[in-house]
Amino acid sequence: MRIAERVVKITEALQIPYVFKGSYRKANRSRLDSFTGIGDEKALKVLRKVHETFGVPTVTDIHSADEAAMAAEYVDVLQIPAFLCRQTDLLVAAAKTGKTINIKKGQFLSPLAMQFADKVVEAGNKNVMLTERGTTFGYQDLVVDYRGIPEMQSFGYPVILDVTHSLQQPNQTSGVTGGMPQLIETVAKAGIAVGADGIFIETHENPAVAKSDGANMLKLDLLEG
């Protein structure tokens, strides 16, 4: 709630729209002992409270078809994780909730392969967004091919650039994903320059103690620029 409150103040001052994203369950972690959540219902109630308190839309990930209806009761947008972006049963279940569906492009896919987002439309839901989150570059790095943003926009869907996840350095021997947060501003500016419809940035008051993804987060004090 503290972070949401601060970001709301920043975005209101800058007169830009803001959507709050939070995971109620971190299902895809590098190690068995990694933090996965505070409990599904408790976390989803926090997301609902963010919406009710600050009046901003909220987003959360779902990982299986049976999660779709549950999560849809609490948030405005359901997000399909990159590693699950082609799972037909997951896409159809999400579509049937009637919520806006944000599909993250798999690191292993070309932008043009994201045409399978039509599965959501064919299931009766035209409210679709796509997210660019980088492409696998060797074993332990990602790069952003900015051509992919207009390519995916050509399908008729808004395209978001996930800045911080695009700067992850996966598959580290430590078992913890690394990152390059010093490049967040550069990647964000480039995404805006090529016409991304929005940018996603993970932020925290102290990334070093964040429960997940701290290595690629932007320190909250730096968010306003």
Region roles according to the model:
Residues 1, 18-40, 203-217:
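Glycine-rich, proline-tolerant flexible connector loops at the mouths of alpha/beta enzymes
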Residues 3-14, 33-59, 94-100, 149-161, ...:
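Alpha-helix-loop-beta-strand connector modules within alpha/beta enzyme cores
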Residues 25-38, 66-67, 85-86, 108-111, ...:
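Short, small-residue-enriched loops and turns at beta-alpha junctions
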Residues 97-203:
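Catalytic alpha/beta core domains of metabolic enzymes, predominantly
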